[in-house]
C-alpha cells in the first residue's frame, strides 16, 4: 500500500523516520526504535497529533495505550495532559481540546495488567467471579500457593493404589523429601500460564513423549536443534585446526605437524557433507574420525616452543569437540533414546494432570478468600474476551471503542498478552490499528517469560513500504550518546549479533547513528580496563607481600581508583541544561553490573577512596544483625523451644549474655531444650546472668500474651519500646541504616497483616519461606535519588535510564548456567524435559530431549546475555568504561588471537556461542582494533576499519593494594615483624580476644570421632593395629578415599574396581540352578547393554571363578536355600564410641554403615557370607599362611557385620564365612569373641 505521509514542515526537529512513525496510518505499524532514538517522544507526539487534529474527530478514551510499568504510564499521561493544555492555550475556544482534557482521566493509559483489571471489574459476571475481589501481592499469592500445593500432595499420598503418583514421586524426587516435586509443579504452573491455553500446553507437553510412531531421532520435532548444535561443533573443530595449522606454518613453527593437522582437517571436512537423514550415518561419521599420533620433533631447538604448544593446544581442542559430540549425542543407542521417552510418558502425563489439579485448586482457594493475583488478571481477561475460540461480544465492543492500540516496549510481550491485544484490535483486518514500539535488542526479560520472537516475526514480515500485513519503521538515530559511545557499541555488536546467535541481525538498519550534538573532547575514548590477577613473581623486600584479594575486591578497587582520578582531575561533562562543560560530579557516574554480588566489595573500595556511594541492592535485609535478632525474638515468642533462636536472643544486646554464660546455662541441664536449661539455671544460680534471665522471662510471657491479644505491629512496637533496641542500634556504626531496617520490619509486618493471613506464627513461617527461597527484601533505603553519590545498579535496573559516565563492571563474571544444567528444563515450544531415571536399577540417563532442550535454552541464554550487554553499553551519554579481571592476561589474549586472521566482520558462530562471560565477546571483538594490535605488537592481527576510539589498560592486581601497604607502614607493622617484636594491638577487644585464644575445649578427644563411618573404612583403619585403644586411629578417621578420575580409569582396573564388578555380578546371578559359562556370558552381555557394567569390567571378570563358587559346599548351600538368601543387605548400626576407643569418658556414638554381600536367614539363625577378590595364589606359600593374614585383615569387618545384623534382626549369627574367588578358599571367622 502507498503510505500517505504528510510533508514534514521545514522547521520540524524530527528525523524523516521519526516523522514517518508519527504520521503513518492505515495498517499495523511496528517501530523498531534503537536505544536513545526518542521512541517515547515519538509515541507521545503521535498521540497528541491525533488528538489535536479535530478533523480526525478522535477522543483520548478511544485510544488504548499500553506501557511496561506504572511509572511509564503515569509519565505518559502527564506528558499527554501537558501537551493538551499547551494546545488549549494556543486555541482556548476549542471544544474538542477541552473535551480531551476532561476525558484524560478516563483514558486507558496503563500497563496491560491494569487494563485487564479494568476489563474484569466491568465484566466480572462473564468470568463468574465475585466483584468484590481484592488484588494481592506476589508474596501473599505464594503463601496461598504453598498451602494449596501441600494439601494437594498430601491428598495424593492418601489415595490407595495411586501407583502413577508414587512412581512420579520416585522418579523426580530425592530420598529425603518431595521438595523437588513441589518446585517442579510450581514452575510448570507458572510456565503454562504464559500461554493462552495452559491446559492445552500441558497436554502438548505429554505428546512429545509419544515416540511409538517415530523410528529415528531425525524424525523428532526438535531434531533441527540437535543438527544445528552438531554443525556448530564441527565448525568449531575446523576453526581450531585452522589455527593450529597457522601456528605450524609460522617461521620456526612445528612444520612436521602439518601433515597430521591437514589430515585431521580433511576428516572433519567430510562431516560437513554427511547425510542427516539417517542418525546411524551421523554416528558412524563421528566414530570414524581417527586422530593419529602427532609426530615427535627431532630437533626441538629448531622450533619456537610457543608455536609448538599453541599448535598442540588447538589440535587438542578440536579433538575434544569431536569427543564431546560422541558423549552428548551418541552415548546411547538410538532405540534406547526413543524408548526412554516412551517409558517416561506415564510420569509426564501424571505430572501434567497434577499441575492441572493444582491450578484448579489454587484458583478455587483464591476465590474462597475473595482475592486474585496478577497471573489471574490476564487469564480472566482472556476468558472474558474469548468465547469458543472467537472474539466475544465484549471483545468486539472494545474493537469498536479503540480506534488505535499503542504498545510501548513491545519486545517484552508474552503470548498471553499478545492474544489479549489482538482480541481488542483490528490487527487481522486489511487495515490494522495496532501501533507497536520497541527494540528487540533490548529484550532482556525472558526470565519473566517475555517472548522476543513475537517482535522479530513482525519485523521480518512487515515492509518499510507498507506492502503486506504491516508497516516497519526503523529509528536508528541516537540522541543520547556521544559518537565515541556509538562507535564502540557498533564496533562490538557488528561482530557479535546476527540472526543465528542473537536472534537478530545487527545490520545497517539496526546500527546506531549519531543524532546528538556534543562539543569536541579528546578524552572520551571508550576504555577497556583489564586487571591481571596473575601474581608478580618477586615481591619487594621492604614491603609486605600483598594478600590474595578476591577478583571482586581488586576490580572494585580499580574502579574506585579510576573514579577518584576523574573527580580529582575534574573530568569535563557536558551539561545539556547549561549547554557547556562542567567538572564531573559523583552523581554523573553509575556502575552497572549483571548482579549485585560485588556491591559490598565496591562499597568498601569506595570508602577507602572517600567516595560517597549508594548500591541499589535488593538483598541482605534478613542477614542484617538487627533484623536477624528481631526475627529470632519473634520465633522465640511464638515458640520458646527453639534452641538456636533462643541462644541468638540471649546473646544479643536485648539480653546481653556472653558465651561463657550460655555455656553455664547448658550445664545446668545438659539434655533437653535450652529453654528448660535456662529455667533451671535461673532457679539454682544467683548471678547477674540469672537476673537478666528473670527479667527476660517476665518480658517473654508479656509478649506472648500480647501476641495473642494484639496485632503484629503492636507487638513489634512494644518490643522496640521496652528493650530500647531501636535506640541501641542507632548508636552503632551505620545506625541510620539499622534503624531504617527496623522501621521497615514494622512496615512489612503491617503490610502482612493486611493480607488474608494473620498472627505471629504465620508471619514467622512467611519469613522462613522467604529466606529459604532467597526472596530477600533488600535493606531499607536511606538515600534519595538526587544526592551526589556514585550509584551502582544492575543492568536490568538501568534499562530506560541514561548517565554521563557508565562503568560496566564484572565483565569476566560467568554467565548464570544454573537453570540450563538443572535436572528439569522447561521450554515454551517443547514443554518439559528431564533425565530418565531407571528406578529398578537406580540409574539416571540424560534423555535426547533433555540434551536438545538444554542446547536450545543455552542458545536463548546466549542471545539474552548479548542483549543485556547491549543495554549496558547504550546507557552511556559521554564516557564508557569497561572493566574486568583476567586470570593471566598473556594466556587470555592468546585465546583471543584465534580470531586474528578472521576475514569476515562477524565473529565465528562457535566462538560467540561458547562464550562464558561478556569478556569473551568483548575481548575477541576489541582485539581486532588497531589500538589492541599496537598494544600486543602482533602484526598478524587483521584489524577492522572503524572510527571507534579505544584505550586498553592492563593493570596488575598489586597496583591496587597501595592503601593497605601504606596503612601497615604507618603502624610500624613491618618493622615490628622484622625485629620479631609484638605487633601493637589497638583493639578495645584485646582482652576478650586473648581469652578466646587461650580457651581449652574439655572434650577435645571427641572431636576426632566421626558421627558416621562405613565398616569398610573401619576395617582398613583397624588393619593397622591389633587393638582399639591406639589414638593413631583418630588420624585415620580424617582420611578420605576418593575414586580414581575418569582419565585414569581408562587404564587397567584397580583391585577395588575388579572387586566391585565381581560383587555386582554375584548380586545378579539367578539362583534357580547352578550357572553355566553360557549363562554367565549372557548375563554379562545383558548387564553391558543396560550400562550396569563397562566393557573393561566385564573383561576383568573370570566367570570360571563364579562357577567354582557354586560348585563349592558353600555355594551349594546357597543354591539349596535360595528362598532364604538375601544379597547386598545394607544396614546402619549405632555403636558406642567408648567401645571402639576403650575410653570410658566418651559419651558419644558412631553410626556404622555397611552392606552384607550375602546372608542365609533361617528361622532362628543367620549365616553371613562375604566375597573377597584378594590375590591368594602365588602370593602366599600355602593356604594356612594366607588364612592367617586374611583373618587378621577381615575379622573386625565381619564381627561388626555380625553384631549389627544380630542387633537388627534379633537372630543369632551362627556362622560367618569369607569366600576367596582366587583359589576357591573358604575361611570361617570366629564371631563368638565379639569386638
From Swiss-Prot:
UvrD-like helicase ATP-binding domain location is 12-482
Please give the name of this protein: ATP-dependent helicase/nuclease subunit A
Which BP terms in the Gene Ontology apply to this protein? double-strand break repair via homologous recombination
**Keyword DNA repair set for record:** yes
Cofactors needed by this protein, per the record, are: Mg(2+)
GO cellular component terms, alphabetically, are:
cytosol; DNA helicase complex
Complex and partners: Heterodimer of AddA and AddB/RexB.
One Pfam family this sequence matches: UvrD-helicase
Q: What is the lineage of its organism?
A: Bacteria, Bacillati, Bacillota, Bacilli, Bacillales
Q: What does this protein do?
A: The heterodimer acts as both an ATP-dependent DNA helicase and an ATP-dependent, dual-direction single-stranded exonuclease. Recognizes the chi site generating a DNA molecule suitable for the initiation of homologous recombination. The AddA nuclease domain is required for chi fragment generation; this subunit has the helicase and 3' -> 5' nuclease activities.
Q: Does the keyword DNA-binding apply?
A: yes
Q: Which organism is it from?
A: Listeria innocua serovar 6a (strain ATCC BAA-680 / CLIP 11262)
* Residues annotated as domain UvrD-like helicase C-terminal: 509-800
Which family is this sequence assigned to?
Belongs to the helicase family. AddA subfamily.
Keyword annotations for this protein, in alphabetical order, are: ATP-binding, DNA damage, DNA repair, DNA-binding, Exonuclease, Helicase, Hydrolase, Isomerase, Nuclease, Nucleotide-binding
InterPro entries named in the record: AddA, DNA_helicase_UvrD-like_C, DNA_helicase_UvrD/REP, P-loop_NTPase, PDDEXK-like_dom_sf, PDDEXK_AddAB-type, Restrct_endonuc-II-like, UvrD-like_ATP-bd
Binding locations of ATP:
33-40
EC number(s) in its UniProt entry? 3.1.-.-, 5.6.2.4
Spell out the reaction equation it catalyses. Couples ATP hydrolysis with the unwinding of duplex DNA by translocating in the 3'-5' direction; ATP + H2O = ADP + phosphate + H(+)
Record GO terms (molecular function): 3'-5' DNA helicase activity; 3'-5' exonuclease activity; ATP binding; ATP hydrolysis activity; double-stranded DNA binding
Amino acid at each position: 500500500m502507498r503510505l500517505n505521509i504528510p510533508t514534514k514542515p521545514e522547521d520540524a526537529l524530527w528525523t524523516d523516520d521519526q516523522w514517518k512513525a508519527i504520521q503513518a496510518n492505515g495498517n499495523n505499524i511496528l517501530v523498531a526504535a534503537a536505544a536513545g532514538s526518542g521512541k517515547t517522544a515519538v509515541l507521545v507526539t503521535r498521540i497528541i497529533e491525533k488528538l489535536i487534529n479535530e478533523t480526525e474527530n478522535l477522543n483520548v478514551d478511544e485510544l488504548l495505550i499500553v506501557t511496561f510499568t506504572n511509572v511509564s504510564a503515569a509519565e505518559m499521561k502527564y506528558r499527554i495532559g501537558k501537551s493538551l493544555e499547551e494546545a488549549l492555550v494556543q486555541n482556548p475556544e476549542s471544544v474538542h481540546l477541552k473535551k480531551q482534557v476532561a476525558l484524560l482521566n478516563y483514558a486507558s493509559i496503563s500497563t496491560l495488567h491494569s487494563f485487564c483489571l479494568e476489563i474484569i471489574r466491568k465484566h466480572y459476571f462473564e468470568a463468574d467471579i465475585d466483584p468484590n475481589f481484592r488484588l494481592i501481592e506476589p508474596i501473599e499469592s505464594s503463601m496461598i500457593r504453598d498451602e494449596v500445593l501441600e494439601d494437594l500432595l498430601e491428598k495424593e499420598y492418601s489415595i490407595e493404589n495411586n501407583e502413577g503418583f508414587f512412581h512420579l514421586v520416585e522418579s523426580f524426587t530425592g530420598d529425603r523429601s518431595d521438595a523437588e516435586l513441589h518446585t517442579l509443579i510450581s514452575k510448570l504452573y507458572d510456565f503454562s500460564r504464559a500461554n493462552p491455553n495452559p491446559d492445552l500446553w500441558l497436554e502438548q507437553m505429554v505428546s512429545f513423549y509419544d515416540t511409538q510412531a517415530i523410528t529415528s531421532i531425525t524424525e523428532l520435532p526438535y531434531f533441527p536443534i540437535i543438527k544445528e548444535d552438531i554443525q556448530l561443533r564441527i565448525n568449531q573443530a575446523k576453526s581450531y585446526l585452522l589455527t593450529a595449522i597457522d601456528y605450524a606454518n609460522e617461521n620456526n613453527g612445528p612444520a612436521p605437524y602439518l601433515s597430521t593437522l591437514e589430515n585431521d582437517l580433511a576428516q572433519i571436512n567430510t562431516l560437513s557433507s554427511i547425510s542427516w537423514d539417517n542418525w546411524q550415518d551421523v554416528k558412524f561419521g563421528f566414530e570414524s574420525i581417527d586422530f593419529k599420533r602427532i609426530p615427535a620433533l627431532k630437533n626441538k631447538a629448531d622450533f619456537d616452543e610457543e608455536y609448538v604448544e599453541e599448535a598442540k593446544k588447538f589440535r587438542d581442542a578440536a579433538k575434544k569437540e569431536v569427543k564431546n559430540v560422541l558423549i552428548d549425542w551418541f552415548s546411547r543407542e538410538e532405540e534406547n533414546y526413543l524408548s526412554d521417552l516412551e517409558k517416561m510418558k506415564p510420569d509426564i502425563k501424571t505430572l501434567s494432570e497434577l499441575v492441572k489439579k493444582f491450578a484448579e485448586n489454587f484458583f478455587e482457594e483464591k476465590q474462597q478468600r475473595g482475592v486474585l493475583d496478577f497471573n489471574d488478571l490476564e487469564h480472566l481477561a482472556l476468558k472474558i474476551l474469548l468465547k469458543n475460540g472467537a472474539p466475544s461480544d465484549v471483545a468486539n465492543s472494545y474493537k469498536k471503542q479503540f480506534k488505535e492500540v499503542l504498545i510501548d516496549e513491545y519486545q517484552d510481550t508474552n503470548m498471553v498478552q499478545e492474544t489479549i491485544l489482538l482480541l481488542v484490535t483490528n490487527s487481522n483486518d486489511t487495515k490494522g490499528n495496532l501501533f507497536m514500539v520497541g527494540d528487540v535488542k533490548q529484550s532482556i526479560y525472558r526470565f519473566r517469560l517475555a517472548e522476543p520472537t513475537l517482535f522479530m516475526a513482525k519485523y521480518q514480515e512487515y515492509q518499510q513500504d507498507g506492502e503486506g500485513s504491516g508497516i516497519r519503521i526503523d529509528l536508528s538515530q541516537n540522541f543520547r550518546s556521544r559518537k565515541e559511545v556509538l562507535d564502540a557499541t557498533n564496533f562490538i555488536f557488528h561482530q557479535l549479533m546476527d540472526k543465528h546467535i542473537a536472534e537478530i541481525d545487527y545490520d545497517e538498519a539496526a546500527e546506531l547513528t549519531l543524532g546528538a550534538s556534543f562539543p569536541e573532547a579528546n578524552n572520551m575514548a571508550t576504555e577497556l580496563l583489564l586487571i591481571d590477577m596473575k601474581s608478580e613473581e618477586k615481591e619487594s623486600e621492604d614491603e609486605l607481600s600483598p594478600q590474595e584479594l578476591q577478583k571482586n575486591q581488586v576490580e572494585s578497587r580499580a574502579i574506585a581508583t579510576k573514579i577518584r582520578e576523574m573527580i580529582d582531575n575534574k573530568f569535563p561533562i557536558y551539561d545539556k541544561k547549561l549547554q557547556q562543560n562542567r567538572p564531573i560530579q559523583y552523581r554523573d557516574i553509575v556502575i552497572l553490573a549483571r548482579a549485585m554480588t560485588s556491591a559490598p566489595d565496591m562499597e568498601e573500595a569506595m570508602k577507602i577512596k572517600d567516595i560517597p556511594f549508594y548500591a541499589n541492592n535488593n538483598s541482605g535485609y534478613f542477614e542484617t544483625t538487627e533484623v536477624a535478632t528481631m526475627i529470632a525474638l519473634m520465633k522465640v515468642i511464638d515458640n520458646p523451644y527453639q534452641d538456636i533462636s533462643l541462644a541468638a536472643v540471649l546473646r544479643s544486646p536485648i539480653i546481653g549474655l556472653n558465651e561463657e554464660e550460655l555455656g553455664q546455662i547448658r550445664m545446668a541441664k545438659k539434655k533437653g531444650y535450652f529453654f528448660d536449661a535456662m529455667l533451671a539455671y535461673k532457679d539454682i544460680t544467683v548471678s547477674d546472668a540469672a537476673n537478666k534471665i528473670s527479667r527476660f522471662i517476665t518480658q517473654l510471657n508479656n509478649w506472648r500474651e500480647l501476641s495473642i491479644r494484639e496485632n503484629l505491629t503492636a507487638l513489634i512496637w512494644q518490643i522496640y519500646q521496652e528493650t530500647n533496641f531501636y535506640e541501641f542500634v542507632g548508636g552503632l556504626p551505620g545506625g541510620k541504616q539499622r534503624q531504617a531496617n527496623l522501621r521497615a520490619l514494622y512496615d512489612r509486618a503491617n503490610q502482612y497483616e493486611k493480607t488474608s493471613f494473620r498472627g505471629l506464627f504465620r508471619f514467622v513461617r512467611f519469613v522462613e519461606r522467604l529466606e529459604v527461597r532467597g526472596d530477600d527484601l533488600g535493606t531499607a533505603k536511606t538515600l534519595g535519588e538526587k544526592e551526589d553519590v556514585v550509584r551502582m545498579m544492575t543492568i536490568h535496573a538501568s534499562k530506560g535510564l541514561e548517565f554521563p559516565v557508565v562503568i560496566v563492571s564484572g565483565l569476566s563474571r560467568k554467565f548464570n548456567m544454573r537453570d540450563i544444567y538443572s535436572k528439569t528444563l522447561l521450554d515454551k515450544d517443547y514443554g518439559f524435559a528431564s533425565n530418565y531415571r531407571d528406578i529398578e536399577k537406580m540409574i539416571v540417563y540424560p534423555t535426547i530431549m533433555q540434551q536438545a532442550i538444554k542446547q536450545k535454552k543455552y542458545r536463548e541464554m546466549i542471545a539474552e546475555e548479548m542483549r543485556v550487554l547491549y543495554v549496558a553499553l547504550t546507557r552511556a551519554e559521554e564516557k564508557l568504561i569497561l572493566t574486568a579481571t583476567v586470570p593471566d592476561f598473556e594466556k587470555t589474549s592468546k585465546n583471543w588471537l584465534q580470531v586474528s586472521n578472521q576475514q569476515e566482520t562477524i565473529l565465528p558462530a562457535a566462538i560467540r556461542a561458547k562464550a562464558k562471560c561478556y569478556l569473551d565477546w568483548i575481548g575477541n571483538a576489541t582485539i581486532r582494533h588497531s589500538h589492541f594490535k599496537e598494544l600486543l605488537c602482533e602484526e598478524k592481527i587483521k584489524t577492522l576499519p572503524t572510527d571507534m576510539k579505544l584505550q586498553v589498560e592492563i593493570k596488575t592486581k598489586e597496583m591496587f593494594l597501595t592503601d593497605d601497604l601504606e596503612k601497615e607502614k604507618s603502624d610500624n607493622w613491618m618493622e615490628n615483624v622484622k625485629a620479631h617484636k609484638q605487633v601493637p594491638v589497638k583493639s578495645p577487644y584485646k582482652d576478650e580476644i586473648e581469652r578466646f585464644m587461650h580457651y581449652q575445649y574439655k572434650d577435645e578427644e571427641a572431636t576426632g570421632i566421626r558421627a558416621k563411618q562405613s565398616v569398610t573404612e573401619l576395617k582398613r583403619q583397624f588393619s593397622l593395629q591389633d587393638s582399639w585403644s591406639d589414638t593413631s586411629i583418630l588420624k585415620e578417621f580424617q582420611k578420605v578415599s576418593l575414586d580414581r578420575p575418569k582419565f585414569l580409569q581408562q587404564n587397567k582396573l584397580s583391585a577395588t574396581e575388579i572387586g566391585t564388578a565381581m560383587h555386582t555380578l554375584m548380586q545378579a546371578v539367578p539362583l534357580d540352578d547352578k550357572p553355566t559359562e553360557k549363562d554367565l556370558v549372557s548375563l554379562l552381555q545383558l548387564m553391558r547393554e543396560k550400562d550396569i557394567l563397562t566393557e573393561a569390567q566385564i573383561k576383568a571378570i573370570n566367570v570360571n571363578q563364579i562357577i567354582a563358587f557354586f560348585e563349592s559346599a558353600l555355594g551349594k548351600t546357597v543354591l539349596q536355600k535360595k528362598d532364604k538368601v538375601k544379597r547386598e543387605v545394607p544396614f546402619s548400626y549405632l555403636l558406642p564410641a567408648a567401645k571402639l576407643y576403650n575410653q570410658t569418658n566418651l559419651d558419644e556414638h558412631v553410626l556404622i554403615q555397611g552392606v552384607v554381600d550375602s546372608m542365609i536367614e533361617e528361622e532362628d539363625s543367620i549365616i553371613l557370607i562375604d566375597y573377597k577378590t584378594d590375590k591368594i595364589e602365588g602370593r602366599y606359600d600355602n593356604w594356612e599362611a594366607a588364612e592367617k593374614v586374611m583373618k587378621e585383615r577381615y575379622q573386625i569387618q565381619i564381627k561388626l557385620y555380625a553384631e549389627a545384623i544380630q542387633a537388627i534382626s534379633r537372630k543369632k549369627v551362627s556362622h560367618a564365612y569369607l569366600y576367596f574367588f582366587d583359589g576357591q578358599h573358604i575361611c570361617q571367622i570366629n564371631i563368638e569373641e565379639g569386638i
